[in-house]
Amino acid sequence: DIDHPDIEEFIKWKVTEEQKVASIVTGSKICSNHLKSIMSACHNCEADGESCFEPSKNPALKREIIAARRNEVPENYIQRIIHFAKPGYKSVEFETYNTDWDSEAYVTVSGQNSNNSVRVTDEFLDAVMNDKEWNLVNRTDGSINKTVNAKELWDQVGYSAWACADPGIQFHTTINDWHTCPESGEIRASNPCSEYM
């Protein structure tokens, strides 16, 4: 319900989770590329022995470390690869991910097996049209938890639906105005796509 006290977090939930996927995919590829370059710089150097693993004595290694740091590769991974290269290891496995909906990246985030909807009332839509405040109401005692701008809340719904296709909208007032058996009680939910409405 659009007046639920947790509605803002609910609206943004899947957007945030999909942003995590983008971060996992991008971060894995950035780390993989830089770590391989650091490993290569350790072994393809003109210095002798241990000097190949010291950035002050191996200019190529220094360049690769600087490039990795610029791209936010964690320092512990940079150092780990250098230590891994010292005993002679020449390659490293660093798994990368993709944005396929059935990929490991999507499996690691929440909300991907849900189809979320927000139920909006005519009262809320009027508040949006008239740029009014909207109360988010506690479910346990009916008290006002927070007051937000209705138009801004509606904009959050629109942005989230654009960014990740959720939440869908269920028009609570209209659904119940068209209820074919109102004696059975108010319709409070449907499948998120609302084919049955």
Briefly describe each language-model feature range.
Residues 1-197:
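Active-site cavity-forming subdomains of large catalytic enzyme subunits
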